[in-house]
Amino acid sequence: VAAGGFITLMKSIPTIVSAFKGGMASMGEKGAVALSRTENDLNFKVVIFGSIGLVALMAFLPQIPGTNIFYKLILGLLVIIFGFFFVTVSSRIVGLIGSSNNPISGMTIATIMATALVFISVGWTGHVYEPMALVVGGMICIAAANAGATSQDLKTGYIVGATPRYQQIALFIGVIV
């Protein structure tokens, strides 16, 4: 499962780079480029500020394990990094095959293993760090599941001619509720 995920990730790298470049370019544009209604996505600034907000929430929520804010900020950064890649894999697989083949468990295990490797490499060993690794894995599990559902929603919206921006706003409201 992990090997298939990494192969999918490698195949997705050109798409990831292209989308990231397009998002960064759209942030710097002064005049709005005329897009058709069905290509109007949520502003890339929302993604950036949402990611920063997630890291800030993780740093200050008392439910997140960690002895100080530094550890919690590292957890937030790991969630952003792993989420960036594993959400891409989840979305791609669900878009190509369907939601029944979303490899959430494999990506969660790979995330926990990678987080454990990061922790070991910086000397964070012991029982106090185990819940921290599980938090990162749990958040990636949730992100991958939401990515699959979002991918299905956007695919259906594309087929019926919906505006992606409004779908994305509705999905944000659903997450908050």
Where are these regions (language model features)?
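Alpha-helical multipass membrane-protein architecture
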Residues: 1-177
